[in-house]
């Protein structure tokens, strides 16, 4: 610290240098205080990091992105979300021979009324509502014809017209008699095959996101086959 006499001797440039040093000391002190606060905040609240996971489910890759500060908690939640999708696949897949959906399709035309799970009942109820709204453009009873076109794509040859005509006779959403209150269903037309490809994936995405939210992971995004559902935006962003 300079004396008044020293200041008078060195003149105003000396005084300016001393003032600049004081300003720098104050700035460094403030910066240090802010850094200490930031370190304390991070230590006590954690820092949300981006985590990405992927698992093959429903014949495609299901991808989950979450922002979380707890890695162990995140892994538990993501596993639960993937497990939920796996359960839904066992219910609604038309590829799995022992799925609940295929077991119902196997009863088509038998006159038997099947008791179905609440899960399948809920999805079929929504599918039937969409069929009515679209005048039959959306129809989950089109499985037999869809299988023909899948095969045509594999072998690169169109199905014969008579085979296609036979499959089309099995299609018609009114041939699915659903009692949504008691969760029973009957397929009245022989040969009808159910295909939930237009609705099952979206339902699975919604359910996976719900599981993540239940575990406290609100900043999450789930995607599969081009479809996406999203929760809260990542930290510091307005959206995904």
Give the location of each predicted region.
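Cationic, low-complexity basic patches in intrinsically disordered or flexible, solvent-exposed regions
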Residues: 10, 19-20, 35
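Basic polycationic patches enriched in arginine
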Residues: 17, 24-25
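Short linear motifs centered on Gly/Pro in flexible linkers and helix caps
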Residues: 25-26, 223
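Mature catalytic core of soluble alpha/beta enzymes
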Residues: 37, 43-240
């Amino acid at each position: 610290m300079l004396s008044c006499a020293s200041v008078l001797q060195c003149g105003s440039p000396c005084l300016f240098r001393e003032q600049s040093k004081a300003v720098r000391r104050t700035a460094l002190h403030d910066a240090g205080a802010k850094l200490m606060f930031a370190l304390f905040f991070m230590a006590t609240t954690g820092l949300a990091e981006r985590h990405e996971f992927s698992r093959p489910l429903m014949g495609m890759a299901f991808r989950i992105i979450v922002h979380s500060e707890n890695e162990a908690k995140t892994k538990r939640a993501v596993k639960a979300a993937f497990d939920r999708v796996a359960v839904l696949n066992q219910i609604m897949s038309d590829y799995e021979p022992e799925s609940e959906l295929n077991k119902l399709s196997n009863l088509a035309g038998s006159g038997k009324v099947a008791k179905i799970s609440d899960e399948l009942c809920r999805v079929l109820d929504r599918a039937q509502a969409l069929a009515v709204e679209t005048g039959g453009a959306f129809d989950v009873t089109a499985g037999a014809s869809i299988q023909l076109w899948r095969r045509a794509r594999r072998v690169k040859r169109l199905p014969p017209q008579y085979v296609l005509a036979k499959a089309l006779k099995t299609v018609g959403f009114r041939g699915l008699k659903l009692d949504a209150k008691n969760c029973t269903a009957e397929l009245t037309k022989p040969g009808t095959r159910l295909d939930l490809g237009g609705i099952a994936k979206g339902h699975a995405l919604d359910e996976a996101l719900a599981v993540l939210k239940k575990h406290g992971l609100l900043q999450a995004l789930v995607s599969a086959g081009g479809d996406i559902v999203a929760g809260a935006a990542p930290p510091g962003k307005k959206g995904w």
